[in-house]
């Protein structure tokens, strides 16, 4: 029997606001435990939340970036559950009236494009974090109340590969808005997956299983592949799939059952009584739309049409906002667009991958990369010498100063080169004769002698011109 897979994804994106969604506590990554908290975060009796307008604005911007319809009238709901990292015993979220609905993103897998629908988007508060050490458990509420957008896809995803492509497209568009850095390693993007399988041609979905808080695209792919295979084996053996929440195990690349999946009734949703309904008007939505930054597709078209890049180069440069911004700054600083693109896609990307860092974590600046490229273009340094200069600018060194201090500047002045060429010719009369007799190797030999004498610093283009002229005059 052949099966088809159906996947839905719930993505939680942490917003880059200065304060939390319902309290004035600051939001920053890496603070001391419980440093960024107040009585609202701790759930003290009698304290009241108030909505952060910036969170609503960012939610609307995310909706516009994902082609979603903004809800004009909405309210918040309480999702009731008890857990140590949730001192109020409920989460303020949106159940009945999400901030946006019916969006989409386009993906491409194996050369085929496909639109993946977005069912709805919610703004809500995050929970705290539990840490277990030995026989002790600790609760850190720094994350409690951090604003989130939950983005719920439609069940349009048919394979783990499509799931990863969807997540990449989602992360890219959210990142370009600037409302979140969507760094999975810091928890600002977390993924819950839902997967089921059914016989090909069936119009009924199979029983789904959920996996929560997966923190890398590779793990998402592995987990979905494992679950799809597990579902099929259970059904082929005549068994039944249990609707449950499972955990991805990095060591085994498999999944482990955690608990029976809860339904919405278990959470006893009801409207949040401490917050009034929220209404947004068309004027504010249009104001936010006018402030939308250029999206990846728009940048790609501009790079191709205005800067002469290939479609492939434009696609690679717009994979992340930091790379695209760096590229544009380097071009503004005078770097040739195609050469800047080549360095970023090759030398810079290779360095980032080897060091396991992001571009923002390095000392490399757009001005220094552009400056190095200009030194190559004007003949100050050779392409070979540029490899050493590149190491210098990775360390934050100014390219011209680094080249001069390390003896990497080419000899291009004819007044300096001509005496060297004359001396080489005086010592190689036979090579002069060979050249005049049509032996081209002689010219290459003489070039080699000149480069050896200058320790590779002579400008090859200038040397070629001067040597040719000198040979013709002898």
From Swiss-Prot:
It catalyses: L-glutamyl-tRNA(Gln) + L-glutamine + ATP + H2O = L-glutaminyl-tRNA(Gln) + L-glutamate + ADP + phosphate + H(+); L-aspartyl-tRNA(Asn) + L-glutamine + ATP + H2O = L-asparaginyl-tRNA(Asn) + L-glutamate + ADP + phosphate + 2 H(+). The keyword Phosphoprotein does not apply. InterPro entries: Asn/Gln-tRNA_amidoTrfase_suB/E (IPR017959), Asn/Gln-tRNA_Trfase_suB/E_cat (IPR006075), Asn/Gln_amidotransferase (IPR018027), Asn/Gln_tRNA_amidoTrase-B-like (IPR003789), GatB (IPR004413), GatB_C_1 (IPR042114), GatB_Yqey_C_2 (IPR023168), Gln-tRNA_amidoTrfase_suB_CS (IPR017958). Its EC number is 6.3.5.-. GO terms for molecular function: asparaginyl-tRNA synthase (glutamine-hydrolyzing) activity; ATP binding; glutaminyl-tRNA synthase (glutamine-hydrolyzing) activity. Heterotrimer of A, B and C subunits. Belongs to the GatB/GatE family. GatB subfamily. This is Aspartyl/glutamyl-tRNA(Asn/Gln) amidotransferase subunit B.
